[in-house]
């Protein structure tokens, strides 16, 4: 059972699908505040790195990875097997339609919305008005859309964290810090 977040990026099987980096995963998981029996969605799951860590944290619950790209779905299957994330279910499809038949979520992570953020959030709160949602945004337009959506649906407990991580890279006998793309982590939950 996973006691802390932060599986190293190198441990995941990767392809061309985007992967939430370790530092961002760790903060995003912290903001989700999962419990052992959480029922979680990972929308736009990519490689499944966050899905796997969610499943290991919510080991008595359920995690649903939703991904539209076939090659990424295959990576999620491979990472599920590698990390023995038996409570991780994988749904190939586009949200929000792919979410309609899933069980009621207690938590949802949105890493990719394909332009359907408002519709996804609407469906999540229809299923559970108290769902805790964490959204990762790489563009200012998505941040704006997330905040407009939060206001429209009456979320009072909103938090935005901007994370800019850098990693060292060896340059001969020296080390240089190489910045990762900055990311906005938005947490939504109704009181």
What are these regions (language model features)?
Residues 104-112, 119, 132:
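Short SAM/SAH-binding signature in class I
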Residues 1-36, 41, 75-78, 82, ...:
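Class I SAM-dependent transferase core
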